[in-house]
């Protein structure tokens, strides 16, 4: 059920020194505090209180709202999804929706999806309320609730319609800041987490993007003894940001969980309600696209094409070419759309890497995706998998070698004409305790995965086969900072002129989201309209 709530945006700006989101939620509570019950005002300072499976129930026996987060629909200017999870059946899950000045004006009933974790036999239920017919470039307030629990507040802003300025951010490979170590030395939660997985969430809020792209390997639940707790830890950490702005994911190899669905992605597919790509229910949510302003974002699932065996199970080729056919059609449609200037691809594994003794680049991506990126002139690719930051020169075409080495078409590093080639970014310093910035080759070289060997019981996977090559495409590498993200500021320009995206890579330097600018560059191209 969707909400039809078109009201004008509040014209008042937040007072100096008060955050925009605090201003919005405080205003909403003042207007409709009685509408959310006696605890309404207290919601403004609500915080995560631990994994949902361990929450103390209220008097009614209902668990609280857990892991509140947002996703965009296919049209980010009019569609949003509010999601939260529990491990118990709940009654009447719903979202109260309104504006900061007018209060809650409608109620949207949520649909519930569930999966049963094969390792713990615990069933997780995720409620998704689809908000539709929203007004572009507008602030909303909402409260997620089900019977017998206290509502949780959030704010949401729709994307602008057409060519308007906007900001988004991107990083991958986050993990969680909650390690969950027991007295006997075992970990019940993510065993490669670090405090920086929490710091980066605070840092994203300091930048306040319209949305954040999370480039795969979200929480590493497939490495954890307790997968349910690890997912809950991840959402508890990130709801500090994701309840205020959509975090749009790409699935990584560590979202592949043995026993959870036919190809291992039931948890990921249940927690997120991303735009429908028209794929079968079994493949739902593994690839998708959405439009924000003049930017078309396409999220891909690279395990379908990668040679590397990096998950709990080897699933290369699982879609039978369905994802590639969808991608080609999606890119063609984007380039036919006169309202789209920029095409950005978000994915996990990478076609470029100068890390030694780590994952490396994957030939499967170079074979399956890069020819399409060239054909349809994709502007920007953001990925993770390698736990550091680096970027390529604009790339177009490939050498006629077995590794299909991408060809740089320009070496200017500050101002880049994106019509000449695609810039690839590795942004994998999201927070894990295994960064790779200290593992970079002294001079740019690349280990390319060209295949896999037979299954090795000692490592419980198929070992990668590597070919080492030079990396003439390498433009910038951050050796010094293990953690960070990139912010992208879209400037639509003027009719008849150019449009640009200014990219700023920030190193996250400690508690409270400390930031240091490390790399900047600007993509530019003729404006389409």
Swiss-Prot record:
Residues 1-52 form the signal peptide. GO terms for cellular component: plasma membrane. InterPro entries: Calcineurin-like_PHP_ApaH, Metallo-depent_PP-like, PPA-like, Purple_acid_Pase-like_N, Purple_acid_Pase_N, TAT_signal. The keyword Signal applies. Pfam families: Metallophos, Pur_ac_phosph_N. SUPFAM superfamilies: Metallo-dependent phosphatases, Purple acid phosphatase, N-terminal domain. Predicted to be exported by the Tat system. The position of the signal peptide cleavage has not been experimentally proven. GO terms for molecular function: acid phosphatase activity; metal ion binding. PROSITE patterns: TAT (PS51318). Residues 1-20 are annotated as: Disordered. Keywords: Signal. This is Uncharacterized protein Rv2577. It comes from Mycobacterium tuberculosis (strain ATCC 25618 / H37Rv).
